Amino acid sequence: MTNIRKSHPLIKIINHSFIDLPAPSNISAWWNFGSLLGVCLILQILTGLFLAMHYTSDTMTAFSSVTHICRDVNYGWIIRYLHANGASMFFICLYMHVGRGMYYGSYTFSETWNIGIMLLFTVMATAFMGYVLPWGQMSFWGATVITNLLSAIPYIGTELVEWIWGGFSVDKATLTRFFAFHFILPFIISALAAVHLLFLHETGSNNPSGITSDSDKIPFHPYYTIKDILGLLVLVLTLMLLVLFSPDLLGDPDNYIPANPLNTPPHIKPEWYFLFAYAILRSIPNKLGGVLALVLSILVLAIIPILHTSKQRGMMFRPLSQCLFWLLVADLLTLTWIGGQPVEHPFITIGQLASILYFSTLLILMPISGIIENRLLKW
């Protein structure tokens, strides 16, 4: 009798994806983040579902309904803070995952990489719309400022913004549609993630050395299931420390003030995980230029495979490229810090320099370093 795990039409798919999957024997902890992202997505969908049972998407009651969840619903406070801080953990894992892909040259799997970029955009859109839902001051003004950026599009900008708003300002129609989109997008993300995995399993995983590992594969279970559980424990511990000891550490105090269209907060800023892109947006004085830079700061990932000049796949044996990679990481941290600062001297200048360095590292310095390393190795 054949094993049901290998013969059943449905269980067979799961078996080929998570149990008998041949995986390289040398992949490090940096390969944990894919499974952690899956766990984060499941956590967000479950906590979000329970929050949606009590939330009302009406401008008059949205803020009160969130307060009601925290005060009156059984364990509502922990569900709300797991959802809010779960988003932060999601983005930490997401940026680590993308960073690992860049460092080890995983972008050479072009289909997997491009779907990953689509996933990144979709997750960012979902997180932005979720931030609007509590209808606090920062929710309202963040929605107003970010949606207003679309008015920079020539000819159709103003009409497009009013179409998204459902009126002449951010109001009830905007909140209702944002809630609807925020609810449906995680399921679209799940479908995209399945396609992402499908394409990855067509080629098999990359590994730190960057060379083919077909001759040295081991089954995913039990080796990497156990390894992933370690990463999961670290993730859960970090998340619970955040939720139980300082749940508002990564939030904005202004969001505990109900939305008021007549009173602008002194510093409008998004959640911490968007600050780097926000800093790039603010570093360009022209509105359309800023919007283009904002979109390109993520879209630049799509042309990284084209700009790969090195004859080696990853950066494991390329010290010059390693230096540039960590320079890029430091630059992104600088941009994140600048994004949270007021628009005044010296932050404006630092932001502009960091933005120039971000694009020049990715588009100019990294391809040049690949060529130099090839020459040094006489390739």
Swiss-Prot record:
Binds 2 heme b groups non-covalently. CDD domains: cytochrome_b_C, Cytochrome_b_N. Its main location: mitochondrion. Its cofactor is heme b. Keywords: Electron transport, Heme, Iron, Membrane, Metal-binding, Mitochondrion, Mitochondrion inner membrane, Respiratory chain, Transmembrane, Transmembrane helix, Transport, Ubiquinone. Heme b b562 binds at residues 83, 182. InterPro entries: Cyt_b/b6_C (IPR005798), Cyt_b/b6_C_sf (IPR036150), Cyt_b/b6_N (IPR005797), Cytb/b6-like_sf (IPR027387), Cytochrome_b (IPR030689), Cytochrome_b_C_euk/bac (IPR048260), Cytochrome_b_N_euk/bac (IPR048259), Di-haem_cyt_TM (IPR016174). GO terms for cellular component: mitochondrial inner membrane; respiratory chain complex III. It is found in: Mitochondrion inner membrane. One of its GO terms (molecular function) is metal ion binding. Heme 1 (or BL or b562) is low-potential and absorbs at about 562 nm, and heme 2 (or BH or b566) is high-potential and absorbs at about 566 nm. Component of the ubiquinol-cytochrome c reductase complex (complex III or cytochrome b-c1 complex) that is part of the mitochondrial respiratory chain. The b-c1 complex mediates electron transfer from ubiquinol to cytochrome c. Contributes to the generation of a proton gradient across the mitochondrial membrane that is then used for ATP synthesis. The cytochrome bc1 complex contains 11 subunits: 3 respiratory subunits (MT-CYB, CYC1 and UQCRFS1), 2 core proteins (UQCRC1 and UQCRC2) and 6 low-molecular weight proteins (UQCRH/QCR6, UQCRB/QCR7, UQCRQ/QCR8, UQCR10/QCR9, UQCR11/QCR10 and a cleavage product of UQCRFS1). This cytochrome bc1 complex then forms a dimer. This is Cytochrome b. The gene is MT-CYB.
